Structure formats: C-alpha cells, structure tokens
Amino acid sequence: MKTSKLILSLGLTLVLCALPSCKGKDHLHLPSTPETISSEVKIVNGVLISYGSGATPTDGIVRLDKEQVHTIGAGAFAGNTHLKEIHAPGVTKIDAGAFKGCSSLMKVDFGAGQHPPFAINEQDKSTYTAEDAFWGTPEDKVLTFNPKANPNYLVYLEYIARHHFAKLDGIEIPTALPSAYAVKDGVLTRIKDNNALSGRGRNGVLILPSNIKKIGEGVFGDKFQNFKAIYGEGVETIEDNAFVACYSLQFVHFPQLKSIGEQVFSFNGRLEALNFPHLETIADLAFNSYGAVNPIRISYLSLPQVKKIGKGVLEGKYEVQSTVLLGSQPQVDFTPYKDDMPQDGSVTFHGMISPILYVTPSDKASYTLTDGKWYGFSIKEIK
C-alpha cells in the first residue's frame, strides 16, 4: 500500500498517516466511523495527541510520518500494551507519560540521528523527553543507533540511562579488545598500556566485547583522564576499585550488572546519570567522594533491584539534587567508617542535596518512614 493520508475536519484538522510498508488490514485497522477515528488517533498541528490500542497494527509496530508528527503528546500511548515498536523519525519532543505503561514496548526508533530527542542544555527548548515518558516500559528495550551518523555518544548514553534502555541497537561492538587489554576467561584483568584509551575521539568511549562478564580489581583506577564513557552489554560483576578516581568518567552502561565491589566509582566527580536495572549488591563506599575537591554530579540513579547497600556508598559533597529510583526497601549499612563521620545513621547518604526517592505504591509500603521521609529522601510514587 502506498503512503496514504486521511484528513478530517472536526473543528480542527486531524491527520492520520498509514505506513509505507502497510500490508492491507493486517497492518493497520482503520475504524469505520469518523467519531471512532478521532477518538483512536489524533494529530493536531504536528502533535500526536492520542494513539489508542485499537488503532495499533496487529504486529504492534507503529510508524509515524516524519512530515506529520514532530511531538508525541502527554500520555499519547499511555497504557497501550499492544505497542511493541515505535518508529518516529521526525519526533523532537516527547511529553509527560507519553509511553507510560507500554509494557510490551521493546524497540524505539527516532531516526538514529546525531542525538535522540534530548536537550543538551536546559536552555534548549527545541527538543526534550519528559522524565516519566517511558516509565512502566521494559528495562530491556532498545534504542536505534547509527554510528555512521556522527552521533554524540555521550548524549545517547545519558538518554538510555535516564529512560531505561538496555542497548543501543546498531552500536558497533568489537569481538575482542586490542592487545593492550588483558582478558582471561571473560574477565578484564588489567590494562598493560596507560595510553590504551588515548585517541578515542571527542566522546572518549570504550565499548567492550559482549563476552566480558567481569571487570577486575583496579583495572581502570586512577589511570585515565580522558576516559568519558564505557559500554558493556555483558558485564555482570565489577571488583574493588575498578574505576576509582576516573575523574573524567561521565557515563557507565552495564545493563546486566549484578554486583559491584568496594570503592568502584569513588572520586568519580563527573558521573551524571546511571541505570543498573539488575544490580543487587553494592559494597562499601562504591560511589563515595568524601573529602574530594570536585563535587558529585550524579543527578539520576536507578537501582530497582538493589537489595544490599554498603556503608558510605553515596556520601560526599554534591553539586546538584539527585533523583533515585529503588524497588522495595534495601538493607543499608549506616555504620560510620571514620571517627569524624556523622554518628546519626545518615552517613551512607550524607551530603546529598534534598534527594528524591521514587518508588511504586506497593514498594513504598516496605519503607520505614520518619515524618514522611526515608533518611532524608522525599518520597514520590511512580504511578
């Protein structure tokens, strides 16, 4: 079927675009009456107002014409459990709760350009994705990516952290690392050349082979100053001090990570947004920056499966307010680790600036709250 357009005048102009790859009624069911069409799919002045489950093709794949849709409006797909893929190459803005509760959504394609719909700075209002746009979608969904489009890797890595994507679909993953990296039985044990990470371009990204399951003790610690991001789809364990004092490290993407050792990310003042959907155990001082000159910049941290948090894990001097997502109340060690530490049981989160904790209503019931707060965290519910 050729691309078709159906225009209705109902006091305002509604435009519905069928897909170029549309194959008869199996691809897209068009309701028979104008009233039903207007309630299922609405596009007004380039804004997708709604796209109901009844209009979703039987294969679950929705494609939006880039000439017709530039914004996905608030709640446009909310609760659509039939949606499996969304292809929207012309979209630059995604409003609140746009895909909230789309529990079958596994692939998102915004055209795989230089960057996803994400503002690089707060002053840029031409492109954005609302904080809760993808809440309630699978943690193992993927975002399309094209390494030949001159992409900004750092913006993509921040986007998939904040909006809970497991992979960049299309990223080039090496089958092995150069000889400067020592790997044995799936464990990255050491880096033999201190210049191994030089010449990685303005993004400073290291992409690990998927067969690397563990990063050994102190491998990257205190060695590299132009190392901005690391991407490893297979990493499950990180041993003590692996990234300690990597002062330039901004993004860490390990979607299968289950445990991290002591001081793994200590004195990493430039870390910004992290999502570890399967992380269960965090050892002592893992993100601690007590006494550091540079403040902590972590503004977003998602740990929905964490069960055990060691002492002093997030203690330090913060520059910004932090948003943290947790599941049920974890076991937290509040033991002071030095004599001059706060003795009031706050040391593990000491120094955080008015932190916000997001939990589901069912998980909230597991928390012990004092005056509506949990160790200084204001509680908000994910609904």
Named regions from a protein language model:
Residues 121-123, 132-136, 159-163, 265, ...:
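A structural signal for leucine-rich repeat
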Residues 37-44, 55-71, 81-93, 103-128, ...:
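Structural signature of tandem-repeat unit edges
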Residues 6-14:
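Sec-dependent N-terminal signal peptides
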Residues 3-6, 18-40, 46:
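Bacterial Sec-dependent N-terminal signal peptides
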Residues 368, 375-383:
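Solvent-exposed adhesion/ligand-recognition segments of exported proteins
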